[in-house]
Amino acid sequence: MTRLVLASASAGRLKVLRQAGVDPLVVVSGVDEDAVIAALGPDASPSAVVCALATAKADRVAGALQAGVAADCVVVGCDSMLFIDGGLCGKPGSADAALRQWRRIGGRSGGLYTGHCLLRLRDGDITHREVESACTTVHFASPVEADLRAYVAGGEPLAVAGGFTLDGLGGWFVDGIDGDPSNVIGVSLPLLRTLLTRVGLSVSALWAAD
């Protein structure tokens, strides 16, 4: 039975997949994201950046799987970033950075890009590789200073792309989106369904594999 392997430590991605009927095997890649981005150069498009990161994660995990899993599985690597003002915003990493980022994006709109890399493995070999990104436009509110500081102090925005969540406390400060909500959380179900179809798998086969 085909197993889905999620090459990500993201709680949001895991939640999306579980709510959609798939309980993946989670394997964290440990990829040096800064090194991958640096190798691309300053002119790389948002799609190229998130796809390169997703691919690096999927490749790293695929090469480390136990034989029993690698015999029949799909490895899914994802990476998300917010594109606004001609630049990419990743995970703030600190409270000060999160505050600066929110003061930049508050009251504005940006594109949340998520790169997806799907690897089909049979008998330990990669038989198919599909790489694509999805973008959802996010319209941000302008939180009052007290709310913004409380949000940042709680720690939620520090380790998520763009410094916000759609399905957590950050949802209070998103006025709306244009596009796929699951993409904002970190894995686009419509795109993942398309990629699975390209490698000959249906989503219902994964429902039975959890």
From Swiss-Prot:
Annotated GO biological process: nucleotide metabolic process
Pfam family, one: Maf
Compartments (UniProt record): Cytoplasm
Main localisation: cytoplasm
Names of required cofactors: a divalent metal cation
Single GO term (MF): nucleoside triphosphate diphosphatase activity
InterPro entries: ITPase-like_fam, Maf-like
Substrates-to-products reaction catalysed: a ribonucleoside 5'-triphosphate + H2O = a ribonucleoside 5'-phosphate + diphosphate + H(+); a 2'-deoxyribonucleoside 5'-triphosphate + H2O = a 2'-deoxyribonucleoside 5'-phosphate + diphosphate + H(+)
Keywords noted in UniProt: Cytoplasm, Hydrolase, Nucleotide metabolism
GO terms for cellular component: cytoplasm
Active site: D79 (proton acceptor)
Entry EC no(s): 3.6.1.9
Record function comment: Nucleoside triphosphate pyrophosphatase. May have a dual role in cell division arrest and in preventing the incorporation of modified nucleotides into cellular nucleic acids.
Similarity comment text for this entry: Belongs to the Maf family.
NCBIfam families on file: maf (TIGR00172)
Name of protein: Nucleoside triphosphate pyrophosphatase
Organism for this UniProt entry: Mycolicibacterium paratuberculosis (strain ATCC BAA-968 / K-10)
